[in-house]
Structure formats: C-alpha cells, structure tokens
Amino acid sequence: MNRHHDLLTAGSGGDTMDGIDQAGENRCSRWFDQMPERAARFFKQSERPLVIVSYAQSLDGSIATYDRKPIPLSSHHSMVLTHRLRAVSDAILIGINTLIIDDPLLTVRLVEGNNPCPIILDSRLRIPAQSRVLRRRGHRCMVAGTIGPSHERVAELEELGGEVIHCRPDPCGKVDLVHLLHQLGRRGIQSVMVEGGGEVITSFLQSRLADHLVLTIAPRFVGGLPALGRLAAAPLSFTDGFYHCCGPDIVFFATPRWHE
C-alpha cells in the first residue's frame, strides 16, 4: 500500500475491501462532513488539491446519446447528493465541450452551502462570451488553457470577469493536468470536484489524479456515448468502497487504488 493511498484513507477505518458495503444516511453524511478536513490534510502533504471525480451514468455505462445530447440520468434524490458534494468542494471542473452543450451554472441550489469556484478545461479558450458561468455572481470563472498570456482572447475573457490559467500543454496539446492542479494549489484551492464530461473524467483517471470517486448509476439503458474511454492495460480497483441507495439510483463511493 503506497503513501498516496495511506494519506487518502487515513482515519477511514478500513483497509482494502473485498466487497462493497451498503451505507445508510449517517455514513453518507459523515463522508460529506469529513471532506473539508480530508482535503486540508491531503493538500498540506501533497501541495495540490484533492480531486473527487463525480458523474452519473446509465446501467449500460452511457452518459449521453450518441449524438451527444445530454439526458437526465440522476433522480432528484441523487442530485441532492451531487449538490452536497459541490457545497463541500472548493472548486468544480468541467471540460469545454460540456460547457458548450449544457451551459451550466455549476452552483449549489438543492442544499445550503457555498458555491464552488468554476473551472473550465479549455485549451484553445473557446468558451463563449455569453456562457452563464462567466456571468454568474461570486467566484470568478477560471479558464485553464494552453494559449499564451499575450493572446487577445485572454484579454477578452478577463474583461468579462474570467481568470485565465496558463498551463503547459501535454503531449496531445491539451492542458497538462498535473501542472493545472499545482497552479490551483498555489491559489489555495484544496479540493476540486470533476463533473465531466467523459473525456475529462477519463483524462483524470488515466493520469492517476482521481483521489475519490462518486458514481451515480441510474436504472436505465441508453445505448449511447460511454462514460469512459480507454484507461490502462490493468483494471482499476478501489478501496473503502460503499454504496447508498438514493431514490431509484445507486451512488457508489470509493478511493481508486493505483497499482505501481
């Protein structure tokens, strides 16, 4: 068991679990209540934010139709849990494709709590000027791109109230996620909730940067776009896993176990 795993599971009261426990409301509440302390402990030792990957999929693993039209998967009950996670996260991150398709606000609405800082992964700074997340009150929207600070698009976004984070490109020309997380750490962000879409979720898992997973499974078949792309040759396993029945949905909580 490596240091990274020890750090994430410290105080959780369990080692690797062969099975998955069913949890009641009390255990779920403790998980959310302990998130800020867990994130602060992780941040102090790693100097980067704790990353919680959270998304909803159908029983057949779809997150959208094949023509990329969003479909409502989460019930109201599981959406409340999603908003609880937003409320205990310092920031919430999505990719530019999700923003263009959904134009979300990324705020906390179904529970009491503070809104997380919105972060958009947008290598080429394609975010539309009319995006709601740029115009909402509160935190400035952070846009992570690979375009240099002298580009005219940077000035346009900053004039709209956004903050452009200049990141190194990875080998594919996209935002280097490790570099981004360390830049967020320097800004004092201790936890980041990654909500999508599938390409972004896959990138965090491929890079072994997902520290916790919260997966909502809806009792539907869609036959659409898969939630995940190719991850690695070895299957990904988890520790400290438990699930909670939330209305018609099942919400799965776990810590990825990265094999050396």
Predicted ranges, named:
Residues 2-260:
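Enzymes that bind and transform nitrogen-containing heteroaromatic metabolites
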